[in-house]
Amino acid sequence: PLPGGDKLQIYLLYTADWVATGAGYDNRIGALWISPATCQPAGSVIAHEIGHCFQYLTYCQALESGAPDDSRAGFRYGYAENAGNALWEIGAQWQSWQSYPEEMFTDYEMETWFQQYHRALENEYTRYQNYWWFYALTEQYGLDAYSRIWRESAYPEDAYQTFMRLYLANDLNAFYDAMYR
């Protein structure tokens, strides 16, 4: 965080365009950029972007704790050659539903999920829809399990690998049991 303890800055942009972006600055502070159009009404979109701010802050906190500035904590790294990381969108969506659960089943993302539910957690096709694993994870291991997955990720793990290391002693059969209960 910046001197004085600021951890999040919110910018309301004077524009007629629709703007909603959550991230941060200089690996030190979370930031949210929104426009009036995204605030009327405030809802899961704003909560989703605030989720990205929290995700960004995970890396900032790792740096404060002495981690090297190499983008290898807090899932700051991407997967494979395209450097994509659907987990950021999946996690932000899950975080938004914590504040706006009534939108979870009415949101247009549900239709996409029903068409794509056979895909793996971090598949790019379901980057906004596949938040169900986080519900199962937190129901089984507590709400802190979500933040532990983020805080204790280790490059080049994906979320499943971090989960296996933290909760299942890297036992693949235990992972299969956990996934198919």
What are these regions (language model features)?
Residues 157-181:
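Beta/coil-rich, acidic/histidine-enriched accessory regions frequently appended to metallopeptidases
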